[in-house]
């Protein structure tokens, strides 16, 4: 497997899990390559422009600091599968921020969004449409991944 995109120590540790039979079909490099393409489109619809960049560099940055956050004793106790799950969590934690043109065009046909919008407008009547939808996406980030 070409692992040139997998630069962090966490990713290198996660690769060892792919030697286990239940994970042999998983390709971290392919996942990261595809995710890199997808995450580069988060701002395409004009949303999240004031947020920090949430492309693959954001994920790489988080993976770089994880080594400093996890105590050495914990790192030694973690299995390769633990590292794999951690890396996958980092990879997909902001995936729900991606909004397609179709989704944005159909937002006013989305009952949960309309309810969210109504409730937020009651509290903050001056909130513009972009900020409303951006907040809706942010609040529902985890659910949007599935």
Language-model regions, residue ranges each:
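Residue-identity detector for threonine
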Residues: 3, 33, 49-52, 74, ...
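Alpha-helical phosphate/pyrophosphate-handling elements in metalloenzyme active cores
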Residues: 48-85
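Active-site flanking loop/helix segments enriched in acidic
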Residues: 36-61, 128-132
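Divalent metal-dependent catalytic cores for phosphoryl transfer on phosphate-bearing substrates
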Residues: 76, 81-146
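Context-gated lysine
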Residues: 7, 16, 32-34, 43, ...
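Basic/hydrophobic alpha-helical interface regions
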Residues: 2-47, 63-67
């Amino acid at each position: 497997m070409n692992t040139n995109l997998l630069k962090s120590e966490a990713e290198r540790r996660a690769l060892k899990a792919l030697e286990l039979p239940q994970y042999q079909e998983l390709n971290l490099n392919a996942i990261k390559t595809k995710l890199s393409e997808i995450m580069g489109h988060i701002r395409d619809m004009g949303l999240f422009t004031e947020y920090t960049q949430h492309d693959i560099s954001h994920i790489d940055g988080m993976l770089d600091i994880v080594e400093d956050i996890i105590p050495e004793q914990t790192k030694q106790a973690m299995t390769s599968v633990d590292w794999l799950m951690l890396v996958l969590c980092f990879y997909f934690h902001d995936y729900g921020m991606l909004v397609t043109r179709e989704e944005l065009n159909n937002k006013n046909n989305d009952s949960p969004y309309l309810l969210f919008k109504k409730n937020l407008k009651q509290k903050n009547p001056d909130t513009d449409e972009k900020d409303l939808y951006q907040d809706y996406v942010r609040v529902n980030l985890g659910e949007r991944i599935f």
